[in-house]
Structures are given as structure tokens and as C-alpha cells.
């Protein structure tokens, strides 16, 4: 059932409801018929430069759905960094706490995408790794007044941990995406996560279990739940996602409709950004309903090339989602 009317905005208009503490990457994308083997040079048929980075991707998707957003991040004092700040502004994202540094280049992601929409990616985090706790403290006011705070692991883990700690202290709902995953993740990441959302390969790294099906994902999610998260979501690409929580520890599979994927790059970030939007603006929806809607939005994103360029706007989506 569609939520009635516009979201209730009881807070002041200029306050960001969704704050993302995370990464900005310039995507350097090559489209090829297939992925190259080790030591092989192959011809691609198209190259383009786009905007990516898990943090900014998630923020852009939330903003395009209508969320008031703020991005806490660090880019280089270079042309990629300048262009990135302009991109955030074009998406109506507050850049008050988008820092620039001379000490490192803006982060980059070299991405190769085949005809099936599968990809391989190498990231060089650059300036992202210089975002520090001092920068977070300068942004404390915007973090403490948010409805939802989102972070990932493309910035220094200690910085993400500090962001989660600050949000939790202020009673702000935390949405943590442990990507890229690290096997020996600090246990505090689990206990500080109201919603812990990862994909199947990240779940494998974090738990040591094989995740090849929804049933496997349910078992891995249980392991993660026992580490102290309130809610665990494991996304399964075209198979949707699996969810469980402290209050409903029985794994539930939320399937998604089948679509023809053109480019799956950034689909997980579209999902997280959509989920952040629903958590902030429609907190009374059931979790299952939020996940169905987030699945739908992520499925729209894989039907176009590029990362943020494939993310839908509210005006392009069915009214039943809002």
C-alpha cells in the first residue's frame, strides 16, 4: 500500500534527514564484450568518466528520491574533485562538509563492464582515506540532527566507526554497509549498526560461510545478527535480499522482479540509498515493505549504463513507492 501524501517533515527544512559519511570516486569505465583474462589485452567499445564511490552513490540515490541529504567526505584539490563537488550540488546534496585536500588525489575506480552487465573494479581511495575524526567533529551538528546516518568502508574504518558512534550517541538511526568487506571487522561495527546491509560476497568474507542461495544467506545473516546488529540484510542481486532482525530472527527472503540487466555497477548502492530514504521519511512502513520498494528501485538502476547516471528520480518512478 502506498504511504499517503508527502512525508511528514517535522524538522526544519534545511536539516538533512539523511547524512552519508563516506567516499567519492571518479569512475573510469570501459565497456567490453567480455572481461579480460590475466595478462590479456582486449578491445573495448566505449569509455566514459562518471561519478561513483559507495558513499556518494548512496547519497545521490536518496537525494533523487526526495531526501534532504548531506555528504561528509573528502576529495582532492584537483579537477576530479572540483567536478565531484559540482555533481553533488547538481543532485541537491549539501556540500558544507565536503572537504578538499592537497595531500591526495580524488579517489578513482577503474571499472570494466561486459555485455552481461557484470563488472570488475579496482579502486584507489586517495583523498577518501584522509577523511578523519576531526572532520567528523566539525560536522557533528549535521550528523546529530539527521534521521539516518549511512557509512561504508571505502574511507578509513576508524572514521566510519567514529561516525557510527556519534550517530548512536545522538539517537540517530545507523545504516552500515561493510563494503568493501574486511574479514577481521572491529566487533563494534556490529553493535553500532541499527541496520547492517551487505551483499553475498561481503557476507562470505565476514562469516567464512559460502553464500550461494537465499537459504545460505539466511544462515550467514544469523551469524551476523549474533554479533550484535539490530537488523541484518544480505542483498542477492537479481534474487532480491534476505532479512532478519533481533525481533524477527527467522530469515525472510524478499525476491525482486526479473529485469534485463545492462550494467549492475552501483546497484547495491542504489538499494542502500533507497533504504536510507525510506528509513528517514517513511519510518512507519514495515521493513519488508521498505525492502520491496528498495529492490524495485535498484532493479530500475541496472537497466541503464553507468553508476549514478542510472539512478532513477522520484518523478520517473511509480507513485505507489511514495
Swiss-Prot record:
Key words, A-Z: ATP-binding, Carbohydrate metabolism, Cytoplasm, Kinase, Magnesium, Metal-binding, Nucleotide-binding, Nucleus, Potassium, Transferase
Binding site for substrate: 25-27, 53-57, 154, 269
Binding site for K(+): 263, 265, 301, 304, 306, 310
Name of this protein: Ribokinase
Coiled coil: none
Cofactor details (free text): Requires a divalent cation, most likely magnesium in vivo, as an electrophilic catalyst to aid phosphoryl group transfer. It is the chelate of the metal and the nucleotide that is the actual substrate.
Classification via PANTHER family: RIBOKINASE, SUGAR KINASE
Major localization listed first in the record, in broad terms: cytoplasm
Cross-referenced SUPFAM superfamilies: Ribokinase-like (SSF53613)
GO molecular function per UniProt: ATP binding; identical protein binding; metal ion binding; ribokinase activity
GO cellular component, one term: cytosol
UniProt pathway: Carbohydrate metabolism; D-ribose degradation; D-ribose 5-phosphate from beta-D-ribopyranose: step 2/2
Alphabetized CDD domains for the sequence: ribokinase
Localization per Swiss-Prot or TrEMBL: Cytoplasm; Nucleus
Function field: Catalyzes the phosphorylation of ribose at O-5 in a reaction requiring ATP and magnesium. The resulting D-ribose-5-phosphate can then be used either for sythesis of nucleotides, histidine, and tryptophan, or as a component of the pentose phosphate pathway.
Named cofactor requirement(s): Mg(2+)
Residue numbers binding ATP: 199, 235-240, 256, 268-269, 295
GO annotation (BP), single: pentose-phosphate shunt
Lineage: Eukaryota, Metazoa, Chordata, Craniata, Vertebrata
Pfam families: PfkB
Entry similarity comment: Belongs to the carbohydrate kinase PfkB family. Ribokinase subfamily.
